[in-house]
Amino acid sequence: MIRNIILDMGNVLLDYNPEVILEKTLDNEEDRQIIRRELFGGPEWVQGDLGIIKNSERFDGVSQRVPSRLHPALKECVENWDICMVPVEGAVDFCREIKARGYGMYVLSNACNLFYEYFPKYFPFGSYRN
């Protein structure tokens, strides 16, 4: 008998698209490419997802690799990247249904320390640790 459902966050519950914050923050494709590569493709992104560093520490490392003229945009991307997360179509309804049927729901995913702040905005079903 199945009692619990385990879900991943990325591309299962939420689509992650860094272009959202890059296009909102930067007008120039060359500048977007720099921040895309150094922030979202850099080691600090992985370290944050692994819990090695906090989201607030990402700026410190990445800022050393981007021109200082881009630091305000970089800071904006670091602080507001969660707007890149959009629920996968049907995911919210699916989660409501499994909770209503009494299943335990667990989310296992590599995510930074801000997970408990941004995830409930999209999936407000209470604890994900049952």
Segments (PLM) and residue ranges:
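Cofactor-binding loop segments of dinucleotide-utilizing enzymes, especially the Rossmann-like FAD-
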Residues: N110
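Alpha-helical elements of Rossmann-like donor-binding domains used by nucleotide-donor carbohydrate transfer enzymes
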Residues: V20-I21, P43, E57, G61, ...
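Short, acidic loop-to-helix structural element flanking the phosphoryl-transfer center
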Residues: H71-Y106
